[in-house]
Design a protein with these regions (language model features):
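Short amphipathic alpha-helix segments
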Residues: 170-174
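Active-site-adjacent helical/loop segments in soluble small-molecule enzymes
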Residues: 5, 72-130
Length: 174
């Protein structure tokens, strides 16, 4: 990909982004490397911005592939050296990205794998005019979670709604 300007990579413990960032920066240092974590499990994002290795009290996200409380020590050093920025995305943004990938690309991605697309779709990074790669790292999503994610994405996009009407429990109310 000689004309790529930016690469967005999901982050859990940091192994994938460390390898990707090192390889790309070794060949083309001008390419921007961006990492993405779920807002409910931002261990590397906190460490990156605080410039120190740290552990979270909890990591809560349906993107279980990146639900990591403590980033790797070695990977933290690599990320600090080779990654340009790390952002977080919400559960709703991840759900919308999964739905967009299904509808537009016919691709089933797990929550962790969809975080780069979520960051791009929701303007979390300065990507205007850049040729960007979103690394979609996995499709291992439970069908029950997928069903809830689809519903959530449809509600977010205004294509599905719930209507509840309170009725008295007596004949003739319907």
């Amino acid at each position: 990909l000689p004309d790529v300007d930016a690469v967005i990579v999901p982050i859990g413990g940091g192994g994938l982004i460390s390898g990707v960032a090192f390889a790309i920066k070794s060949l083309r240092p001008e390419v921007k490397i961006y990492g993405v974590q779920a807002a409910g499990a931002p261990s590397m994002e906190h460490a990156f911005h605080d410039h120190k290795y740290e552990t979270l009290d909890s990591a809560v996200t349906f993107a279980d592939g990146i639900a990591v409380k403590t980033p790797g020590e070695t990977t933290f050093d690599m990320v600090s050296q080779y990654v340009d920025e790390i952002v977080t995305v919400s559960e709703d943004e991840i759900a919308a990205a999964i739905l967009a990938l299904m509808e537009n690309q016919k691709l089933v991605a797990e929550g962790a794998g969809a975080t780069p697309v979520a960051a791009a779709l929701f303007g979390k990074l300065p990507l205007a005019g850049k040729k960007t790669v979103c690394l979609i790292s996995g499709g291992n999503i439970d069908v029950n979670i997928l069903s809830r994610v689809i519903t959530r994405g449809l509600v977010m996009s205004g294509r599905k709604t719930n209507l509840m009407i309170a009725l008295e429990d007596k004949p003739g109310q319907l």
